[in-house]
């Protein structure tokens, strides 16, 4: 319906009034963002990134040397191979970056609550345990549909990307999905957040956070590591010595 001249003047005056009122406020207005979803971002030191790249090269040259993870993962990727805890770079990655990152996420979220509202997640009353870790090799046309994970935490570590994956398109990007659909007319614009894969950067997020990976076009491979971890109330229990499978007693597997 066309706006009449009188309605146009009235709307213009209201807009001017609101603008002037905002400029003359003696007490500032505050916008409160409700129900935040926290995602932790970090970066690996260069020597560790290089060690993991060398491990990825070795694994992909002889894929059968590591268990195939694709049968229990959601991704439609060229290769998905489980990594063992005794392989080069795996323990430093877990102990110095992934589990500390999960701990940082817990403290960021839980310490906002009053002490009586923190349940079992008080420091010293729980422990973190890695469930599994695997290598993803994505080529043109491969993708990962929207999915979640089992356990408490999941995450991705970017190792290598082809040059055509850039911020100019969504190709090859990781996407975090919100709980509602995107709808610009009603100001719902933050329901999908895309992350450009940068080698050495990693992201940790709650396992229930829906996410996906877009396909890309052209030559080259996109390498990443992914993991699942769980937070367990109670003090840590002593573990048997020797090599321990990161996949034993896996409660639920969905994939990255």
Question: Where on the chain are the PLM-derived regions?
Answer:
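N-terminal acidic, proline/glycine-rich, low-complexity intrinsically disordered segments
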Residues: 1-6
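Catalytic core of non-heme Fe(II) oxygenases with the double-stranded beta-helix
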Residues: 124-204, 214, 221, 231, ...
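Karyopherin-beta/Importin-beta family HEAT-repeat alpha-solenoid scaffold
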Residues: 27-30, 212-214, 246
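Intrinsically disordered, low-complexity coil segments
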Residues: 111-125, 238-239, 243-249
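Non-heme Fe(II)/2-oxoglutarate
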Residues: 7-123, 141-143
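Short beta-strand micro-motifs in enzyme catalytic cores
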Residues: 38-40, 221-225
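Double-stranded beta-helix
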Residues: 228-256
């Amino acid at each position: 319906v066309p706006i009449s001249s009188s309605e146009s003047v009235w709307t213009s005056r209201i807009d001017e009034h609101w603008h002037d009122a905002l400029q003359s406020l003696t007490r500032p207005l505050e916008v409160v963002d409700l129900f935040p979803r926290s995602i932790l971002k970090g970066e690996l030191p260069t020597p560790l990134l290089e060690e993991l790249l060398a491990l990825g090269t070795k694994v992909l040259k002889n894929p059968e040397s590591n268990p195939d993870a694709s049968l229990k993962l959601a991704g439609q990727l060229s290769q998905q191979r489980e990594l063992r805890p005794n392989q080069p770079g795996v323990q430093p990655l877990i102990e110095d970056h992934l589990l500390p990152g999960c701990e940082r996420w817990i403290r960021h979220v839980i310490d906002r609550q009053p002490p009586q509202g923190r349940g079992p997640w008080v420091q010293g009353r729980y422990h973190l345990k890695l469930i599994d870790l695997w290598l993803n090799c994505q080529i043109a046309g491969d993708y990962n549909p929207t999915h979640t994970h089992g356990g408490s935490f999941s995450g991705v570590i970017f190792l290598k990307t082809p040059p055509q994956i850039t911020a100019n398109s969504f190709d090859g990007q990781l996407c975090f999905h919100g709980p509602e659909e995107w709808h610009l007319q009603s100001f719902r614009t933050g329901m999908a957040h895309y992350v450009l894969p940068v080698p050495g950067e990693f992201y940790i997020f709650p396992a229930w956070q829906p996410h996906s990976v877009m396909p890309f076009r052209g030559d080259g491979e996109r390498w990443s590591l992914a993991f699942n971890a769980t937070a367990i109330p109670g003090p840590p229990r002593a573990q048997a010595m020797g090599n321990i499978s990161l996949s034993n007693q896996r409660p639920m597997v969905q994939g990255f």
